[in-house]
Amino acid sequence: MSEKLFDVLPLYVANRDCRKRTKINQGGTSSGKTYSIMQLLFTRAMEKCGQVITVVGQDIPNLKKGSYRDAKNIRNASPVLQKWFPKVNEGERIFYCVNGSIIEFNSYKDAQDAKNGKRNILFVNEANGVPFDIFWQLYIRTSDEVFIDYNPSARFWVHEKLLNRNDVQLFISDHRQNTFLTPEQHAMIEGIEDDELWKVYARGATGAITGLIFPRFNVVDALPPREEWKMNV
């Protein structure tokens, strides 16, 4: 492919060149993580014939406002991609490549629903809105690569079940690496006043759950015997 597809951020290159099976993209708002992954999925679809690439979100409305909208914008801005992906089924949310590859966008109501279908590449968009049991069914039916992205408003199954695996690479990004933003957009994000929200959305750091009556707690596998904690009245 000698023609230029699109301009990319360093995050695109980092994900493209990573040899780990699972690429986790934790980031603040407007870091370019979803957009960069969608650009890469177009590239992956073009590189090999007959690829099945599945993009998963919490539900269809969120997909349409997020990664699916990004995908349409990326394709529509590139004459080269329009030649490679001449057909888009809006009803089924599928991009068809001339080499037989497809990029499909879907959500799943439960783990049983997620057992249907296999794929070469999986992208779980805003993964903290997708239950782990659904992710797992999709993950074990994916042959090649898995991409995950999210805003880290609080710890969830990615932190507990994936980050300690040897086949996982974590990328942390924030708006400062997104050179396509305007100075006003950067300033707006930097101007977030709440410290916890600033940490999450301006720096891509993992936040804590807010609004809890008991903000400090530990999760245990089981309670001790009742005789050790019951109250005598």
Region annotations inferred by a language model:
Residues 60-120, 206-207:
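Inter-Walker segment of RecA-like/P-loop motor cores
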Residues 128-178:
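Signature of the SF2 helicase/ATPase Hel1-core->accessory helical subdomain module
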Residues 51-63:
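Conserved RecA-like ASCE P-loop NTPase motor core of nucleic-acid helicases/translocases
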Residues 1-21:
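Pre-Walker A adenine-sensing motif
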Residues 31-49, 70:
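Walker A/P-loop NTP-binding motif
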Residues 123-124:
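Hydrophobic residues in beta-strands of the RecA-like P-loop NTPase core, especially within AAA+ ATPase
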Residues 18-25, 51:
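Pre-Walker A (Motif I) flank of P-loop NTPase domains
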Residues 178-233:
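ATPase catalytic-site recognition across NTP-hydrolyzing enzymes
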